[in-house]
Amino acid sequence: MQGHPAPPRRRRRGRGVLTGLLVFGLVVSGVVVAGRWVADGARSLPFLARCEASVGDRSVSVTPEQAQHAATIAAVAEQRGLPARAVTIALATAYQESKILNLDYGDRDSLGLFQQRPSQGWGTPEQVRDPTYAAGRFYDELVKVPGYTEMPVTEAAQAVQRSAFPSAYADHESDARVLASALTGWSPASLSCAVTPSGFSAEVQDESGFTPRAAGVAAELRSWFGDDTPISTYQTAGGRSTHDRGLALDVFFPMEDGAGGREGWAAAHWLVANA
């Protein structure tokens, strides 16, 4: 891509990819959306092998690394209050520039998910290879484009990237739409990941009822979706639940204003992608 000078700005929340966690289920009611996670140290824990987003009659398959980066791109937009259209544009761009991979190489000095060039004012090499920073810098420039939400995806992407191949982003629009719809929560229960066993040692829960890994999930989720996100270890499934051993969490998003459902699914899909 060509450079687009702008003063670098770092906006980062979250502390890295979650490990040792398994999505157990998602419950939707008229009151809350609850995402339940299991972090069971007594047996082998999962490692993602493949993820699939399905919306309508279209499905998109991505690797765990791609899913994690796509989820970060969507979560940064969520933090900034940007629409799903912005996420679609960003994902189409990342597909074209890097295949949604955090590359340590590129044309001239281009690096990272969006192949941003440090020499052109996008940030330091370390910054543009930070997915959270890179997504934020992309959105910094996207929101400066007048009417970007009404423009064709490829034109909006090109207005930011100034690529030598301005129409190439259109090739990825359909896949980007599917991922964006799932990761922004507009398409409920639309992201799943296949897993294979990976060993983790057992952990002891603390006085709050959390194991260290479960506490890490709670902190990570709140860093992205709000410090006031209610997270509980309350046991709701009788003897079948693992809440009483600190191995499961319930995450609640209130539904009063109608937004909780979408936000809840956005958080749930982020958790799936980052398991």
Q: Can you describe what each PLM-predicted range is?
A:
Residues 11-13, 17, 32, 109, ...:
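Generic detector of intrinsically disordered, low-complexity, polar/charged segments
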